[in-house]
Regions:
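Conserved acidic donor-binding segment of nucleotide-sugar-dependent glycosyltransferases
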Residues: 298-299, 303-310, 319-324, 339
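N-terminal strand-loop element at the rim of the active site
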Residues: 7-14, 21, 27-72
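Carbohydrate-associated surface elements
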Residues: 41, 151, 170
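Short alpha-helical donor nucleotide-sugar binding micro-motif in glycosyltransferases
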Residues: 244, 252-257
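Acidic anion/phosphate-binding donor-loop and adjacent secondary structure
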Residues: 126, 154-157, 170-188, 232
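Membrane-proximal helix-turn-helix segments that form the acceptor-binding/catalytic region
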Residues: 125-145, 151, 159
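Conserved donor-binding/catalytic core segment of Leloir-type glycosyltransferases
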Residues: 4, 184-202, 208-212
Length: 366
């Protein structure tokens, strides 16, 4: 079985899609399944290039309030044909199959079984402008469709009505659980961590406004992993903002944090960072939005608050500081929640889709 994994986003686009693709390909490697990875070009050199092809210069586009690097190059068709001809994949697995010219070129040229995973909860305005009709012929070339959540399924099913199998994102439970703590920040301060791009919809500004408005009767430290933010001062709060960090350092910061704050303003397709926090034994405060509330049950494995409600956010921070038993209950329940969501299990589900699709001689669901 030969797999060609196609990721629409460049590997310098941090976020859920690349996290998913990276972990999937690592599992394919661990399980000795022959595969290659194809992405748009990137300046990042941290990924193993052995079986990694980069095609097409990237452009930063706005998508549902976030930014992503995709290729729109019309000159990649020859390279795509060459990869398909030389590698002869049994399966082409496309992540966000209509996002840019790379996955579209693979669909146009594919003679393989095509599997598509849909990650987005809103997508670009292309569909809303009716361009989804242009993609109808390409859509017919997809044999099996996966969505990472019910939210992602509901979005894409608005434009392409099919049966979607839901296979959620996974988490490296052992990796985050066994990450070492950072001694210099394990003191008497309450460590609150935010992880993600500084896009408006991610809600970092809500957290900052909360910490500026409320004075807590205990010391607080804010850790921001993501964009570097210049001239950020919040009362007497110590701020750590190293920018984007690798997975190992992220795991260490999560292990050293008391609370992960995920104050997104709009619905998310999933929320991998919530699973990572659970694996790292970190309590969670998250917005009560689609995607997040598929993972978090309020007062069970996290606290859910109204989006952009700084009063609720402040109260939740104080609650988790003051009530250690409640905090530990959330952490324990979080550990139970992710028990079956480790990447070993999730990748097995995806591999089973590969095998079943190869054994199915008919094109499914058209």
């Amino acid at each position: 079985m030969k797999i060609c994994v196609v990721c629409s986003y460049g590997i310098d686009s941090p976020g859920g899609v690349w996290n998913h693709v990276f972990n999937l390909t690592q599992q394919l490697k661990n399980k000795k399944i022959q595969h290659i990875l194809v992405t748009p070009e990137s300046e990042t050199n941290t990924y193993d290039r052995t079986n990694h092809y980069q095609i097409g210069k990237t452009f930063k586009i706005n998508s549902a309030g976030s930014k992503a690097n995709i290729t729109l190059s019309p000159f990649i068709n020859k390279q795509v044909k060459s990869i398909i001809s030389n590698y002869k994949p049994d399966i082409i697995h496309l992540h966000e199959p209509f996002a840019g010219s790379l996955p579209i070129s693979f669909l146009l040229n594919s003679q393989s079984k095509n599997i598509a995973t849909f990650h987005s909860n809103q997508g670009t305005n292309l569909y809303k402008f009716g361009l989804n009709k242009i993609f109808k012929p390409l859509d017919k070339k997809i044999h099996v469709r996966i969505a990472v959540s019910k939210t992602a399924e509901n979005f894409i099913n608005t434009y392409f009505q099919h049966v979607y199998e839901i296979i959620p994102n996974g988490v490296n439970t052992e990796f985050f659980n066994k990450a070492k703590k950072i001694d210099k920040i394990k003191d008497n301060k309450l460590n609150i961590i935010f992880i993600g791009r500084n896009d408006h919809r991610k809600g970092l500004n809500t957290l900052i406004k909360t910490l500026k408005k409320y004075t807590f009767d205990f010391p607080v430290r804010l850790i921001i992993l993501g964009n570097k933010i210049s001239n950020l001062n919040i009362n007497n709060i110590k701020i750590i903002n190293p920018g984007y960090v690798n997975e190992s350092i992220k795991a260490e910061y999560l292990q050293s944090s008391d609370i992960l704050c995920a104050p997104s303003l709009k619905k998310e397709s999933f929320g991998i960072i919530l699973l990572e926090a659970m694996a790292a034994n970190t309590a969670i405060i998250a917005s009560d939005i689609q995607g997040y509330n598929e993972i978090i049950t309020n007062n069970v494995n996290g606290l859910l608050i109204e989006p952009n409600n700084i009063n609720q956010l402040a109260q939740s921070i104080k609650k988790l500081h003051d009530d250690k038993n409640q905090k530990q209950k959330l952490i324990t329940n979080g550990n139970s929640y992710i028990k079956n969501l480790n990447w070993d299990n999730i990748s097995d589900k995806i591999i089973n889709v590969y095998k079943n699709n190869l054994n199915n001689k008919e094109i499914a669901d058209h």
